[in-house]
Amino acid sequence: MCIRDRFCSVRKLDVLQELLEDSGITEIMVNGWQHIFVEKNGRIFPWEKHFTSPEKLDDVIQQIAGRCNRVINTLHPIVDARLDNGSRVNAVIAPAALDGPVLTIRQFPEEPVTMERLLAYGSVTEETLRLLIPLVRAKYTILIGGGTGAGKTTMLNALSAFIPEDERIITIEDNAELQIQGIPNLVRLECRAANIEASQEITMADLLKTALRMRPDRIIVGEVRSDAEELLQAVNVGAEGSMSTIHANSCRDMITRLETLVLMGINLPLPAIRRQIAAGFDIFVHLGRLRDKSRRLLEICEIDGIVEDEVVLNPLFLYEEECGLVQKGKLKHRSKLERAGITLEDGL
């Protein structure tokens, strides 16, 4: 073992340190001590190196958990954490993991991906940016949906670059990973999991209630989960221009997911939930991964009110296999644009 390997084994994260120092790697997947996979440039492949023993992988997992004041053991075999560089970590051990400890690390770029880079990658088009950028500036409330690894957080970071710098922004996340830049009046809040005595938890609901008392111009929530009813309350009581992400398979599915998440926390009639969704959100953006593993903006829809207790969507752009992103309609609700003194280009 060379001096560097010995140092990484003792002071760093052992064999994973080399991967963590590669800015091109977006995901590190450890399936037991002998099998490591990485994602780079949208493709997943096995790595030739592995841990020297099961105990060494256990040590690394305990080291990560300890740095974040988290506990992982047979009674609490699952932990979410964050590395010093901001990477998001999920670890699972026995008895939940049947074939050895599982460690997954999501890495984020040192510098946030800009909208210019997304345009160069082909993830977005100039036509969609001519719509989305004015909507962000005019404080349209936007929800970004997609599957795991679709680029939701990347899109949220890129859109946030167009928020006027004189606004007060509050961000709320389970694990801090947003890279909001150019906003001097920025407050970052992070949830905290309960300790082993099931106390001292700080939930998304706690932080959303707190954020509303902090005079926000906008609230940016990293991901909507079980406390969705609190986010609906926030966007319905004046936090216009707020943005968030959600796991969903289409713009229509984003409505169903919101309904389900709200019902997990509070028993409300579906028509009441749908009215809150229609009143609180203005725009849905859906992202996905194509068969070639590339990430693409697939759909943009405008929330067009309620008809017979159903949320009505006005499709603005839709991805088609042969044509790419195709404009399907024009924005109907323009009052926020008018108040902001912003005019969309002709045809949008």
State where each predicted segment sits.
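NTP-binding/hydrolysis catalytic cores, primarily Walker-type P-loop NTPases
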Residues: R4, D292-L348
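N-terminal anchoring/assembly modules that precede and organize ATP-driven motor systems
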Residues: R4-F45
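P-loop NTP-binding catalytic core
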Residues: D22, H35-A138
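Flexible beta-alpha connector loops of hexameric P-loop NTPases
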Residues: E48-T52, E116-V124, N185-I202, R218-V221, ...
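P-loop NTPase switch/communication element
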Residues: P109-A120, N157, A161-K209, M254-L258
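Hydrophobic anchor at the beta1->P-loop junction of P-loop NTPases
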Residues: I144
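Conserved lysine of the Walker
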Residues: K152
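Conserved P-loop NTPase nucleotide-binding/switch module
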Residues: E173, I180-Q181, A211-G305
